Amino acid sequence: IQHQHLATELPKLISAYGYKHYILDNNDLDNAITQINDCDENHTICVIKKDTFDKVTLKQEHQLDLSDCIPRGEFLMSINKQFKDTDTLFIGTTGNTAREMYSFMPDTNNFYMAGNMGGALSIGFGAAKAGRKVIVCGGDAEFVMHMGGLTTAGRDANQVNLTYILFDNKQNKSTGGQDTYQSHVDYISIAKASNFSVVENTIESLNEFKYIMTDIKNKSSLKFMCVKCGLDDETPRPPLDIVKVNKF
């Protein structure tokens, strides 16, 4: 929703902060280059309209090989089968995680954090504090956006029924598949230090995932698990009327 409003009001917001701005010229390349150079040399912001640039495929040396990993969609379909028509609340982080949940989890109770990266765990924690059974579906890049949410949830570990699933595909798929450069981050140890009950190993098989999800379905705890996953084909965005839902 923030994208819908920010896109139309961005020039006003820039002016309110006291900056100048250009709308990047998408008809005259020479003028566009002049605008970009001017923005680089002065306190001027360049606003780029949608579809100004064509889609660019990453160079081969920057592409990650995830061919040996199970696509995230298969894990999500497993969740849909296990939690179909239950009152468990699923919070989906922004980007492809939410899009794939919309496509592969049609029978679960989903809340999508569209355009709001890093807040999924905090929203899920709030719902869990209110008495809901919550499962947050996050990603590796999203994990580091608001790590304070981990320690906040960990403080009330005995009072909430909340599971945080981190789907690690090592990239930002929705913005082009760029490497997150987070191979040095030990997600499991960070969650454990924040007082989560953790699955000690990274999940790579569908059978192990199903087994753990069955345990989560039947128990109440503050749980964390990291799932190594691959990529699915592009899936559609959830419709705006679904994204606009503001109640669980």
Label for each model-derived stretch:
Residues Y19, H62-L64, N195-F196:
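Short glycine/proline- and acidic residue-enriched helix-loop micro-motifs
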Residues I1-L24, D30-C39, I45-I48, I165:
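N-terminal alpha/beta PP-like core and its mobile active-site loop of ThDP/TPP-dependent enzymes
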Residues I48, D54-Q63, P239-F248:
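YjeF_N-associated NAD(P)HX repair module
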Residues D25-D28, N96, I203-E208:
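Short beta->alpha linker loops
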Residues I1-A7, S15, A32, G73-S78, ...:
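Thiamine diphosphate
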Residues I48-F53, T94-A98, N169-Q171, K228-D233:
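Glycine-rich beta-alpha junction loops
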Residues L58-M117:
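Active-site diphosphate/adenylate-binding microenvironment
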